[in-house]
């Protein structure tokens, strides 16, 4: 949601899709307040997914995740949403939903440009063909988890070697990004 709102504030026409829980009206209201199109959001009678991010005095974060409705995506729902988009459209994903591998495969087959923020980094990513990613947007901790390297230059080098077609933005906490 934060990425959708930030893009909408920058003047981009943004559609946000996903499954929200019974308490999700606040999320819908926030998105709509900033001009995010919520046509493809579906509300379910279960608890929604949510994330708590703790940031220390050095700008480093720790993420606590409850999957909720974010883990209830179906292939039918994904196909229904993707049917409204076309080649060249951007799809921004985080690793907070199920069926990520299916979504990446389908969007790529349609010619969409896939931007992936692999947060939270976990084993689900190994099921995804990450060669289909147009742009990785990750922090240095996720970069280390991907590559085993701590140095930002080494992280970028390894990621560029492994995914030569992808663009990479590596955020460095309080030190900006590269």
Each predicted region: which residue ranges?
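Glycosyltransferases and closely related glycan-assembly transferases
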Residues: 86, 101-114
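Short acidic active-site motifs
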Residues: 77-81, 99-102, 123-126, 154-155
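Conserved phosphate-binding/catalytic loop of the ribokinase/pfkB sugar-kinase fold
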Residues: 16, 41-43, 53-90
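Conserved phosphate/ATP/ADP-binding segment of small-molecule kinases
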Residues: 108-115, 119-178
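Short beta-strand scaffold segments in enzyme catalytic cores
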Residues: 5, 50-54, 62, 176-178
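Short beta->alpha connector loops
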Residues: 20-22, 95-100, 118-122
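Substrate-binding N-lobe of the ribokinase-like
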Residues: 1-50
């Amino acid at each position: 949601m934060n990425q959708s709102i930030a893009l909408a504030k920058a003047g981009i026409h943004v559609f946000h899709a996903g499954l929200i829980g019974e308490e999700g009206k606040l999320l819908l209201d926030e998105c709509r307040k900033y001009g995010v199109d919520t046509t493809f959001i579906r509300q379910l009678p279960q608890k929604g997914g949510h994330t708590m991010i703790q940031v220390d005095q050095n700008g480093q974060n720790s993420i606590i995740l409850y999957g909720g409705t974010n883990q209830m995506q179906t292939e039918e729902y994904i196909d229904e949403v993707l049917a409204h988009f076309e080649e060249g459209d951007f799809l921004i994903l985080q690793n907070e939903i199920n069926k990520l591998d299916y979504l990446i495969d389908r969007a790529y087959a349609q010619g969409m440009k896939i931007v992936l923020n692999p947060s939270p980094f976990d084993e689900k990513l190994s099921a995804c063909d990450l060669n289909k990613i147009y742009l990785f947007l990750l922090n240095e901790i996720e970069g280390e988890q991907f590559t085993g390297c701590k140095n930002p230059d080494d992280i970028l080098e390894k990621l560029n070697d492994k995914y030569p077609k992808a663009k990479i933005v590596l955020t460095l906490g309080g030190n900006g990004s590269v």
